[in-house]
């Protein structure tokens, strides 16, 4: 699911969101970015 990482990691809007990237990559996406403290997979 594209948004499966939203609930797993509350990330910082600015700064380091490696957790989001890792979660999205495990889900089969290229990576992820953080918007409004929520992880969005790309």
From Swiss-Prot:
The presence of a 'disulfide through disulfide knot' structurally defines this protein as a knottin. GO terms for molecular function: potassium channel inhibitor activity; toxin activity. Blocks in a reversible manner human and rat Kv11.1/KCNH2/ERG1 potassium channels. Also completely and irreversibly blocks rat Kv11.2/KCNH6/ERG2 and human Kv11.3/KCNH7/ERG3 channels. Also weakly inhibits Kir2.1/KCNJ2 and Kv1.2/KCNA2 potassium channels. It is found in: Secreted. It comes from the Eukaryota. This is Potassium channel toxin gamma-KTx 1.8. Keywords: Disulfide bond, Ion channel impairing toxin, Knottin, Neurotoxin, Potassium channel impairing toxin, Secreted, Toxin, Voltage-gated potassium channel impairing toxin. Disulfide bonds join 5-23, 11-34, 20-39, 24-41. One of its GO terms (cellular component) is extracellular region. Expressed by the venom gland. InterPro entries: Ergtoxin, Scorpion_toxin-like_sf. SUPFAM superfamilies: Scorpion toxin-like. Belongs to the ergtoxin family. Gamma-KTx 1 subfamily. Negative results: does not affect human Kv11.2/KCNH6/ERG2. It comes from Centruroides elegans (Bark scorpion). The lineage of its organism: Eukaryota, Metazoa, Ecdysozoa, Arthropoda, Chelicerata. Pfam families: Toxin_17 (PF08086).
């Amino acid at each position: 699911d594209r948004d499966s990482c939203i609930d797993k990691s509350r990330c910082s809007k600015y700064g380091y969101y490696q957790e989001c990237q890792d979660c999205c990559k495990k889900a089969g996406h290229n990576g992820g970015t953080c918007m409004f403290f929520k992880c969005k997979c790309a």
